[in-house]
UniProtKB/Swiss-Prot annotation:
The keyword Ribonucleoprotein belongs to this UniProt entry's keyword annotation: yes
One GO BP: translation
InterPro entries hit by this protein: Ribosomal_Su5_D2-typ_SF, Ribosomal_uS9, Ribosomal_uS9_bac/plastid, Ribosomal_uS9_CS, Ribsml_uS5_D2-typ_fold_subgr
UniProt organism field: Histophilus somni (Haemophilus somnus)
Any one Gene Ontology cellular component term annotated for this protein: cytosolic small ribosomal subunit
Protein name listed in UniProt: Small ribosomal subunit protein uS9
Keywords: Ribonucleoprotein, Ribosomal protein
GO function terms (MF aspect): RNA binding; structural constituent of ribosome
PANTHER family, per database record: RIBOSOMAL PROTEIN S9 (PTHR21569), SMALL RIBOSOMAL SUBUNIT PROTEIN US9M (PTHR21569:SF1)
Length: 130
């Protein structure tokens, strides 16, 4: 791709995103589709835009994202994490602001496994006294 671009990898749940940023007009492309087309939910779009709005670079950078795995929420979180890492590579002075907002830390929460003898991870069968 271009010489003056920065890269960041983001992960959340079982999703993984590769984010490339370069100077531009604020266009966000995810898997060859516009942000508004890819994410139907407004909350997911907001999550993706959060790091850019925080550092006020929304209309100064173009983003090219490839994301795979997981669901809508996990993918949005992975993209946010990737954008954050790419922004830090772009300008290291943005790190404290992004850290304070909690975007730099990888959310390590995963789905808890189902246990035998239980309905789900923690849901027990109904107790019958008699």
């Amino acid at each position: 791709m271009a010489e003056n671009q920065n890269y960041g990898t983001g992960r959340r749940k079982s999703s993984s995103a590769r984010v490339f940023i370069k100077p531009g007009s604020g266009k966000i492309v995810i898997n060859q589709r516009e942000l508004d087309v890819y994410f139907g939910r407004e909350t997911s779009r907001m999550i993706v835009r959060q790091p850019l709005e925080l550092v006020e670079l929304t209309d100064k950078l173009d983003l090219y994202v490839t994301v795979k795995g997981g669901g809508i929420s996990g993918q949005a979180g992975a993209i946010r994490h990737g954008i954050t890492r790419a922004l830090i590579e772009y300008d290291e002075t943005l790190r404290p602001a992004l850290r304070a907002a909690g975007f730099v830390t990888r959310d390590a929460r995963r789905v808890e496994r189902k246990k035998i003898g239980l309905h789900k991870a923690r849901r027990r069968p109904q107790y019958s006294k008699r």
